[in-house]
């Protein structure tokens, strides 16, 4: 699995992520959900847990103990609680943010996580980026934001700047938490040589427990009006709903692979391109009207993608090297001696 080219996994992640919103929309009935959407993340975590367990079992049977490394020390295992805790806080901050700003403003502010990921990537993982790569990350944020901005004829342009200051502060916090969770997960995946499937098993075990805690909290909040969550967990589920669960679980597994064998920037590009792909697909599936902003956003993001990942010699003309310059001088000297 580790020998798989990272760009293949990144493209697959882009396709699956782009279909996430489409499948979720198709799972609705009469403009709403017949199922409890809070159960979807829980089942996705369980799916990832089962798949990781099966792959770990297979790896342990077919590989030697030297190639399949597992760290069971509690000091190491407990670190996997932190990403789940960050995501739990992030989800609550998301809901709080949406009480102050509208959906369009929230989506645009969400693009701050692109830049914050780059900053945390440098600060915490000590990974250096070239000036050209920093420019590419900035362009990616501009491109995704441009594609989401509506024209003044469709919605009030002033609405982007009329929210209370608390809304903007919470939006910045939300972007920071999202980036921090990704960066910390990458740190965990690369801090030792443990097999990916064992790391996933730890990550998704705590993820499942936190999702159970959320479902129980929802039951208490609503006074068990519809009964305990485990008695109605599959109520209203359709084939499309199960596809949403499988899609969400599969994207999670791909993200963890990228965290182990690539990095957060690759994931950011994959998810950003997925957003644009979703918009394009919506033109055909949901009669979404394409806009100039969407076209410009796609062009800018493609430019950013090329700037970040293309080999340097394809972007600029490389200067003459000292070695080549020395050869030129020798040639001139020889010619002068011949003439004399």
From Swiss-Prot:
<keyword id="KW-0813">Transport</keyword>
<feature type="transmembrane region" description="Helical">
    <location>
        <begin position="79"/>
        <end position="99"/>
    </location>
</feature>
<dbReference type="InterPro" id="IPR007271">
    <property type="entry name" value="Nuc_sug_transpt"/>
</dbReference>
<dbReference type="GO" id="GO:0015739">
    <property type="term" value="P:sialic acid transport"/>
</dbReference>
<feature type="topological domain" description="Lumenal">
    <location>
        <begin position="190"/>
        <end position="200"/>
    </location>
</feature>
<feature type="topological domain" description="Cytoplasmic">
    <location>
        <begin position="218"/>
        <end position="238"/>
    </location>
</feature>
<feature type="topological domain" description="Lumenal">
    <location>
        <begin position="27"/>
        <end position="36"/>
    </location>
</feature>
<feature type="transmembrane region" description="Helical">
    <location>
        <begin position="37"/>
        <end position="57"/>
    </location>
</feature>
<dbReference type="GO" id="GO:0015136">
    <property type="term" value="F:sialic acid transmembrane transporter activity"/>
</dbReference>
<feature type="topological domain" description="Cytoplasmic">
    <location>
        <begin position="58"/>
        <end position="78"/>
    </location>
</feature>
<feature type="transmembrane region" description="Helical">
    <location>
        <begin position="239"/>
        <end position="259"/>
    </location>
</feature>
<dbReference type="Pfam" id="PF04142">
    <property type="entry name" value="Nuc_sug_transp"/>
</dbReference>
<feature type="topological domain" description="Cytoplasmic">
    <location>
        <begin position="1"/>
        <end position="5"/>
    </location>
</feature>
<feature type="topological domain" description="Lumenal">
    <location>
        <begin position="100"/>
        <end position="102"/>
    </location>
</feature>
<keyword id="KW-0762">Sugar transport</keyword>
<protein>
    <recommendedName>
        <fullName>CMP-sialic acid transporter 1</fullName>
    </recommendedName>
</protein>
<feature type="transmembrane region" description="Helical">
    <location>
        <begin position="169"/>
        <end position="189"/>
    </location>
</feature>
<feature type="transmembrane region" description="Helical">
    <location>
        <begin position="283"/>
        <end position="303"/>
    </location>
</feature>
<feature type="transmembrane region" description="Helical">
    <location>
        <begin position="201"/>
        <end position="217"/>
    </location>
</feature>
<keyword id="KW-0812">Transmembrane</keyword>
<dbReference type="GO" id="GO:0015165">
    <property type="term" value="F:pyrimidine nucleotide-sugar transmembrane transporter activity"/>
</dbReference>
<feature type="topological domain" description="Cytoplasmic">
    <location>
        <begin position="304"/>
        <end position="340"/>
    </location>
</feature>
<feature type="topological domain" description="Lumenal">
    <location>
        <begin position="260"/>
        <end position="282"/>
    </location>
</feature>
<feature type="transmembrane region" description="Helical">
    <location>
        <begin position="103"/>
        <end position="125"/>
    </location>
</feature>
<dbReference type="GO" id="GO:0000139">
    <property type="term" value="C:Golgi membrane"/>
</dbReference>
<comment type="similarity">
    <text>Belongs to the nucleotide-sugar transporter family. CMP-Sialate:CMP antiporter (TC 2.A.7.12) subfamily.</text>
</comment>
<keyword id="KW-0472">Membrane</keyword>
<comment type="function">
    <text>Essential protein. Sugar transporter involved in the transport of CMP-sialic acid from the cytoplasm into the Golgi.</text>
</comment>
<feature type="transmembrane region" description="Helical">
    <location>
        <begin position="6"/>
        <end position="26"/>
    </location>
</feature>
<keyword id="KW-0333">Golgi apparatus</keyword>
<keyword id="KW-1133">Transmembrane helix</keyword>
<feature type="topological domain" description="Cytoplasmic">
    <location>
        <begin position="126"/>
        <end position="168"/>
    </location>
</feature>
